[in-house]
A protein has these predicted regions:
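Conserved phosphate-donor/acceptor-positioning beta-strand/loop module used by diverse small-molecule
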Residues: 97-113
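Conserved small/polar residues in nucleotide/adenosyl-binding loops
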Residues: 143-149
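Short, solvent-exposed loop/turn segments at secondary-structure junctions
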Residues: 10-11, 33-35, 83-86, 107-110, ...
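Glycine-rich phosphate-binding loop used to anchor ATP phosphates in small-molecule kinases
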Residues: 68-88
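Active-site glycine-rich loop that binds ribose-phosphate moieties when present
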Residues: 127-134
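Surface-exposed cleft-lining segments at the edges of enzyme active sites
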Residues: 113-124
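A structural motif corresponding to the C-terminal end of an alpha-helix
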Residues: 134-142
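PAPS-dependent sulfotransferase catalytic core
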Residues: 1-72
Length: 152
């Protein structure tokens, strides 16, 4: 199973990623489109040069890695995605090949948490606009997600 967890900033998504990372049957990938986003946007984020050096900058390479065969040791993978990283130049067709889950926190709490660190955030900075677009793009095929359990 490939889970694409979609979140905006300040949604406690890292804590959820760590929870999946503690499962022996899951591999975890943190913000795979971050370098592609930084390349396309030109934004000067903290650790920009390190991210650009460590991650693929081409969205096609990111997608190929996300859809590559899974290792036997980790039959499932959890991708933590930030909705604001999905700019217009990043293809979305691959989303039909994964289980998409949207992590949504009360907007007032997101704004308060984000505004404590950054002045005058926009809806785009918070990922709300992109999350709505991605949600509308994904076909409704699951009403809930049940993770497989080990057989006793």
């Amino acid at each position: 199973m490939r889970i694409a967890m979609w979140s905006g900033p300040r949604n406690l998504s890292t804590a959820l990623m760590y929870a999946f990372g503690n499962r022996a049957d899951f591999a975890v990938v943190d913000e795979p489109f971050y370098a592609a986003y930084l390349t396309q946007s030109g934004l000067d984020h903290p650790l920009r040069s390190e991210v650009l050096a460590d991650q693929p900058n081409d969205p096609a390479d990111v997608i190929a890695a996300m859809l590559a065969p899974l290792p036997k040791a980790s039959p499932h993978v959890y991708h933590k995605h930030m909705t604001q990283h999905m700019t217009a130049g990043i293809p979305r067709e691959w989303m039909r090949d994964v289980v998409n889950v949207f992590l949504i926190r009360h907007p007032a709490r997101v704004v308060a948490s984000f505004a404590a660190k950054f002045e005058n955030p926009s809806l785009e900075d918070l990922g709300f606009v992109q999350q709505a677009e991605l949600y509308d793009y994904v076909p409704v095929s699951y009403t809930h997600l049940t993770l497989p359990t080990k057989q006793a």
